[in-house]
Amino acid sequence: MANYELTYIVRPDLDKDAKAALVTRFDSILSDNGAKIDKSEDWDTRRFAYEINNYRQGTYHIVTFSSEDEKAVNEFDRLAKISGDILRHMIVAVDLEKLADAHAKQAAATQRAAERRAQREAERNAAQAQSSASNQARTAATTSGK
C-alpha cells in the first residue's frame, strides 16, 4: 500500500460553505476510488510569489492518504485539473519511515534550539544582574564618600 501527501490550493474568494463542500467532494473522490484518508485539513491562506489565475493568494489544503493502486490518485488529478476552484495541486508519494525520521530530527533540532536560547537568555540575565550590582556598589561608594 502506497502512502501519499496531496496539497491543493483553493480559490480565496470561496465562502466557507462552498469550500467545505469542495473539500468533502474531493475527499469522497479519493475514498470512492479506494483510498483511505488519514488526515484532511486546511493549512493556511498564503500569498503567492506570483499571480495564479489572477489571484494573489490562496487557501492551502493538505490530505494524507494511502491507496493500493493509483486509481484514486489519477481520478483526483483528472478532476482537479477540470475544477476551476482548485488553482494548483501536487501529489507526492511518501515513505512513512523517512517521514517519521525527518519529523524526529526536526523535533530534536527545535528542542536544541530552545535549550540554546534559554541558556543564552540566562547568561544575559546573569550579566545584567552583575552589571547592575556593580553599578549599585559604585553608586553607594560614591555617595558614601561625599
From Swiss-Prot:
CDD domains: bS6. Residues 106-146 are annotated as: Disordered. Keywords: Ribonucleoprotein, Ribosomal protein, RNA-binding, rRNA-binding. GO terms for biological process: translation. The keyword Magnesium does not apply. InterPro entries: Ribosomal_bS6 (IPR000529), Ribosomal_bS6_sf (IPR035980), Ribosomal_S6_plastid/chlpt (IPR020814), Transl_elong_EF1B/ribsomal_bS6 (IPR014717). Residues 113-124 have a biased composition (Basic and acidic residues). Residues 125-146 have a biased composition (Low complexity). It comes from the Bacteria. One of its GO terms (molecular function) is small ribosomal subunit rRNA binding. GO terms for cellular component: cytoplasm; ribonucleoprotein complex; ribosome. The keyword Ribonucleoprotein applies. HAMAP family: Ribosomal_bS6 (MF_00360). Belongs to the bacterial ribosomal protein bS6 family. Binds together with bS18 to 16S ribosomal RNA. This is Small ribosomal subunit protein bS6. The gene is rpsF.
